[in-house]
Regions:
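An N-terminal assembly and electron-transfer interface module characteristic of large anaerobic redox
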Residues: 1-178
């Protein structure tokens, strides 16, 4: 079976903000894909005893025989390499498609009402900066809901998560073609 790695911000696990990630993982599994979700901090932080994305990818998506995944879905906002102590050549040596999942910084109603769709901030964080990593673009799969009192949650756009899952499957199939 095809294997999909999903890179998830460690902070979302700490804050219990996982509804959108659960819907994405369910959408991938509905397509009969094996999924390895991995929580990671974007850069190594010795104070918090956390590794960076490159170490997390190496530890969980690779074994002694090689890469375990056919495609990587990155749900971390921003670039994986720009302004971070991460070696961009590491991602090139993976030789795996990396899909950038868009987590909107606006609520669903604003996004749907906006004829331009994504805001300049969304475009910068989700599209422009990740382009430096050589990622493949996908679709918004989640939006931000501000519940007040510093309670911000990210909620799923279920139909978009399904589209993202289908795109991941197609890229995984394409990667295996001789």
């Amino acid at each position: 079976r095809l294997m999909v790695g999903v890179l998830i911000p460690r902070e979302e696990w700490i804050w219990g903000d996982l509804a959108h990630q659960k819907v994405l993982i369910e959408a991938l599994r509905k397509r009969d894909l094996n999924v390895i979700p991995v929580f990671s901090h974007w850069a190594a932080d010795p104070i918090q005893h956390s590794t960076g994305v490159d170490t997390a990818i190496e530890n969980y998506f690779r074994d002694k025989t090689g890469w375990r995944i056919d495609v990587l879905v990155n749900t971390l906002k921003f670039s994986l390499t720009v302004g971070r102590p991460v070696n961009i050549e590491f991602f090139q040596t993976m030789d795996r498609p990396i899909l950038q999942a868009y987590n909107l910084l606006q609520d669903e109603a604003s996004w749907r009402a906006n004829p331009e769709g994504m805001t300049p901030l969304d475009l910068s964080f989700s599209i422009s900066l990740p382009e430096f990593d050589g990622v493949i673009h996908s679709v918004p799969y989640a939006y931000k809901e501000d519940r007040g009192a510093n309670d911000i949650r990210h909620l799923p756009l279920a139909e978009r998560a399904g589209f993202l899952a289908r795109k991941a499957e197609k890229w995984a199939i394409l990667r295996r073609k001789p």
